[in-house]
Amino acid sequence: MATTDETESLVGVLRGTMLALVRREGSDLSARQLAVCLTCYLESEAQTVRGLAATLDVSKPAITRALDRLAEFDLVRRKTDPADRRSVLVQRTPKGTAFLRDLRAIMKEAAKPKPVAAEPAARKKAAAKSARTTR
């Protein structure tokens, strides 16, 4: 079980990752769209709308809306399953693969330890000391 410090660290990584994602140019994905995208790229077998709905425990129409948005950004592509023409397979795209690679880099950056900011009093003292030594 994660300790409080580990949990806080994970929340910090999530926050840093989400901030980087919303600040960057290009696609701005909702949490659901990101979950669908990650499931498509991190699961080894091909995904279907029905399978994604079951895995994520959301309705098929919600998955369809998320896939519509992901397809707009060319992060996934849909293809009719040749083995069962009633089923739709969700395929990866080169742009989606690049997005996942960028996401991993963003998460690594967000996970790096951050320097502790000095307290205002300590900053003033350091500035005063610096001013005295430069005169």
Where is each model-derived feature located?
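N-terminal leader segment of winged-helix/HTH proteins
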Residues: 1-28
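Amphipathic alpha-helical dimerization/coiled-coil segments
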Residues: 17-21, 101-135
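N-terminal helix-turn-helix DNA-binding core of bacterial DNA-binding proteins
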Residues: 19-58
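Canonical helix-turn-helix DNA-binding module
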Residues: 46-88
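Basic, amphipathic "hinge/linker" alpha-helix immediately C-terminal to the N-terminal HTH DNA-binding motif
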Residues: 82-103
